[in-house]
Structures are given as structure tokens and as C-alpha cells.
From Swiss-Prot:
Annotated catalysed reactions: (4aS,6R)-4a-hydroxy-L-erythro-5,6,7,8-tetrahydrobiopterin = (6R)-L-erythro-6,7-dihydrobiopterin + H2O
Top-rank taxon: Bacteria
One annotated GO molecular function: 4-alpha-hydroxytetrahydrobiopterin dehydratase activity
EC number of this enzyme: 4.2.1.96
Protein name: Putative pterin-4-alpha-carbinolamine dehydratase
Chaperone as UniProt keyword: no
GO terms (BP aspect): tetrahydrobiopterin biosynthetic process
Keywords: Lyase
Organism (species): Shewanella sp. (strain MR-4)
UniProt record similarity statement: Belongs to the pterin-4-alpha-carbinolamine dehydratase family.
Length: 112
């Protein structure tokens, strides 16, 4: 499979398929620092990034905002002193789409 960071998000309509259990098992191995959370019955990807201070956390948040606008796919973001919690899911399908895994991998790349 092509590296997730080399892929582009595709338009995700309300009738787009959610990832299957098999796809989930394969894709989650490609982003090992991410976990799967279920909130209100909606499966989501989540990761907490740690930073030395608020300014670094905010700089990361701003880079993530630029990436989200570029890919036209937007996460939940909670920026706090020393950490940023990022949550990816596809609102239109109320669950996980391949786009979410692509964006999780690209989010990790922002640390480089």
C-alpha cells in the first residue's frame, strides 16, 4: 500500500463507505501512535502531542490548521499548555474514512 502521507483526501459524501474492520486493522498499523475512540457511537482517531510550552503547542496547531485547509478535511483540536489533542473523523459519514488515516499520518509529519 502507498504510504498514507503520499495520498490525497478525496471528497467524502454522506453515502461514502466507512472503513471496514479489516481496513481499520490494516490502516491503524500505519499510524501506531494513534488510538481509536468511540464518542456518541462515532468511531474517531485520536492522538495527544506533547510540547515544552504553550507557544510550541500553538505553533503546531497553526501548522495543522494550514494542512486541514489544504486538504479540505478538518479535525477536532484541543490546544492546551504543553499539549495538543487531535481527533480525526469524517463528519458526513459519522465515522472513519480512509481520509482520516491519511490526515493522521500527515499530522504526524508536521513534527518533522
Amino acid at each position: 500500500m502507498t504510504a498514507l502521507t503520499q495520498m490525497k483526501c478525496e471528497a467524502c459524501q454522506a453515502d461514502a463507505p466507512k472503513v471496514t474492520d479489516e481496513e481499520l486493522a490494516e490502516l491503524i498499523r500505519m499510524i501506531p501512535d494513534w488510538g481509536v475512540q468511540v464518542r456518541d457511537g462515532i468511531m474517531q482517531l485520536e492522538r495527544v502531542y506533547k510540547f515544552k510550552n504553550f507557544k510550541l503547542a500553538m505553533a503546531f496547531t497553526n501548522k495543522l490548521a494550514d494542512l486541514a485547509e489544504e486538504e479540505f478535511h478538518h479535525p477536532g483540536i484541543l490546544t492546551e499548555w504543553g499539549k495538543v489533542t487531535v481527533t480525526w473523523w469524517s463528519h458526513s459519514i459519522k465515522g472513519l474514512h480512509k481520509n482520516d488515516f491519511i490526515m493522521a499520518a500527515k499530522t504526524d509529519q508536521l513534527l518533522d
